Amino acid sequence: MITAEMVKELRERTGAGMMDCKRALVETNGDIEKAIDELRTKGLAKAAKKAGRVASEGVVTSYIHGGGRIGVLVEVNCETDFVAKTNDFKQLAYDIAMQIAASNPEYLNREEVPQEVINREKEILKAQALEEGKPEKVIEKMVEGRVEKFFKERCLLEQAFIKDLDKSVQELINENIARMGENITIRRFARYEVGEGIEKESCDFASEVMSQLK
């Protein structure tokens, strides 16, 4: 059975259209890796074809919000200096910086999350499920689902893009890879907030960033 999650994963990894991804999954009986090969053969896996190419050019972009209360630096890479200087690429980098300011990700992707952090989250989530009186047989699936939610909230590439919540940041990047014709990656980022780590009256700066987009 081909699920919406499978189609979404294939889209994120290839940048191909939704119907093309669905057809490829049907033709390969739901095998993601074979579906990628199928799309590449047909010339549709634009992002997958470019993912292995070296992206050593790019920009370091900053975003400062609220009179200097939140600051972000992010390095976004592409293959050539020509693309790095385009307005489209600069706008992409700026949008990613705003995303980081608003959504406060802790990691770039799920591969960066330490195993001990994942294990701790699982223990907490399992304890919560037991506290809710859930049957043992459904707890494992519940924990799996909540760990996925954890990744989508804490990992930049899996977060919903603040300007279009129907797509992830990874899908945004894949769209730009397809349009610009070069591999694009986020190498690293840093986010600073005034008074971070100091006990103070709560102030939701992230919501302020989000409100600017409305």
Curated annotation (Swiss-Prot):
PANTHER family listed in its UniProt record: ELONGATION FACTOR TS, ELONGATION FACTOR TS, MITOCHONDRIAL
Residue spans crossing the bilayer: none
HAMAP family cross-referenced by the UniProt entry: EF_Ts
Gene: tsf
Cross-referenced CDD domains: UBA_EF-Ts
Region feature (Involved in Mg(2+) ion dislocation from EF-Tu): 80-83
SUPFAM superfamilies: Elongation factor Ts (EF-Ts), dimerisation domain, UBA-like
Function as written in the Swiss-Prot or TrEMBL entry: Associates with the EF-Tu.GDP complex and induces the exchange of GDP to GTP. It remains bound to the aminoacyl-tRNA.EF-Tu.GTP complex up to the GTP hydrolysis stage on the ribosome.
Gene Ontology MF, one: translation elongation factor activity
UniProt keyword list: Cytoplasm, Elongation factor, Protein biosynthesis
Localization terms from the record: Cytoplasm
Pfam families: EF_TS
Family: Belongs to the EF-Ts family.
Name the record gives this protein: Elongation factor Ts
InterPro entries membership: EF-Ts_dimer_sf, Transl_elong_EFTs/EF1B, Transl_elong_EFTs/EF1B_dimer, Transl_elong_Ts_CS, UBA-like_sf
